[in-house]
């Protein structure tokens, strides 16, 4: 039985992960037990989860919300931690042996490193951790003998396709698929008056707001491009991206003999979540089966980098390397937050991200502080450029 610490339990990935645990337990299997839960501030849902799954400990990032939760669950035998220290404390619990990090943003970096240093099996859905601190994360994982299990559908697909590979030198390239988001096929002139509500209408996937906006700008695929470089130790030139509107083929690998292997399934995040939690075993899933006869055709297109400029910015950032991916990620997080508040336009996101990718200096990443400082400077630039104060 794997004993799970779930960071980000009230978010999109977190709630789906708990659906997976329910399904596995309903099937009579006891492969996963929820040992710890963490959330940012949604203590109403977190309390419900605590009463259902009975974890040993929980953490709330927002300090005031943590105090309220302590009062709400004083009748239960559960320890309530708070802040960044609380998130990290959960990953070090002796009773925990696997951590699923599904928090959104740079806040996920320190808990990931702490979990790896504690030699916990690590399932990562927090792509910003690898984008900003990929060299640190992979170095720490290697030093502690930990294999990182990807939860993003595309990276899970690549991970599954690689099972049974004889030698890494047999691999020619990996091919990530992108849905294209809600604005596929549109040009820049058609995207001048996009509102948050428009960008939040994803055609295939049920995701949180930030990730859905990133999908609409193709920033999500740029982040996944960087993530793939670190997860699979690939050069940027050996990673391709194709737009696949149906979201049935989740990603592919090509071998030296030009044979191609793909992972297919209906677009449901519970498949990659479950595989990460139960790896290397597989269990019955709550997800419906894929019936290929229902699909008359599957389509593939080259991404439009001229219109969706964030994607190219990410590729340029990882080629320059160092702290620049952290800066680009920080700029995007700040810009998306402003867009969701309708303080800037949808197209402003790409302009801000590209400016950081093309003009910011880069430096070697030697510590968490290097990553956090690059992130801070990029966020400060975005806020200053948009007339906002850092708060």
Question: Across the structure, where does each feature detected by a protein language model lie?
Answer:
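Catalytic, metal-anchored helix/loop core of enzyme active sites in primary metabolism
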Residues: 1-391
């Amino acid at each position: 039985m794997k004993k799970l610490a779930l960071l980000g339990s009230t978010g999109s990935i977190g709630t789906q992960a708990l659906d997976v645990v329910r399904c596995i337990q309903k099937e009579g299997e006891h492969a996963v037990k929820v040992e710890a839960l963490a959330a940012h501030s949604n203590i109403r849902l977190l309390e419900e989860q605590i009463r259902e799954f009975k974890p040993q400990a929980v953490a709330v990032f927002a300090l005031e919300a943590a105090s309220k939760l302590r009062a709400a669950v004083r009748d239960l035998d559960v320890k309530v931690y708070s802040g960044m220290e609380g998130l990290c404390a959960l990953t070090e619990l002796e009773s925990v042996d696997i951590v699923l990090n599904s928090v959104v943003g740079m806040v996920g970096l320190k808990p990931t490193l702490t979990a790896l240093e504690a030699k916990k099996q690590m399932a990562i859905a927090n792509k910003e951790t690898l984008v900003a601190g990929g060299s640190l994360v992979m170095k720490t994982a290697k030093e502690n003998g930990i294999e990182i299990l990807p939860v993003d559908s595309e990276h899970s697909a690549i991970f599954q396709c690689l099972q049974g590979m004889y030698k890494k030198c047999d691999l020619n390239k990996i091919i990530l698929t992108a849905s294209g988001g809600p604005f596929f096929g549109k040009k820049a002139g058609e995207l001048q008056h996009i509102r948050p509500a428009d960008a939040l209408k994803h055609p295939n996937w049920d995701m949180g707001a930030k990730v859905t906006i990133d999908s609409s700008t193709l920033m999500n695929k740029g982040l996944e491009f960087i993530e793939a470089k670190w997860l699979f130790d690939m050069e940027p030139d050996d990673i391709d991206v194709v737009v696949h509107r149906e979201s049935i083929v989740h990603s592919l690998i090509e071998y030296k003999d030009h044979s191609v292997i793909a992972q297919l399934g209906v677009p449901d995040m519970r498949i990659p979540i479950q595989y990460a939690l139960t790896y290397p075993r597989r269990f019955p899933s709550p997800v419906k089966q894929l019936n290929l006869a229902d699909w008359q055709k599957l389509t593939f297109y080259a991404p439009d980098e001229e219109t969706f400029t964030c994607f190219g910015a990410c590729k340029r950032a990882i080629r320059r390397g160092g702290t620049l991916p952290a800066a680009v990620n920080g700029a995007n997080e700040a810009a998306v937050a402003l867009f969701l508040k309708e303080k800037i336009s949808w197209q402003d996101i790409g302009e801000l991200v590209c400016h950081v990718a093309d003009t910011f200096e880069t430096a070697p990443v030697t510590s968490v502080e290097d990553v956090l400082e690059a992130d801070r400077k990029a966020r400060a630039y975005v806020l200053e450029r948009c007339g906002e104060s850092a708060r």
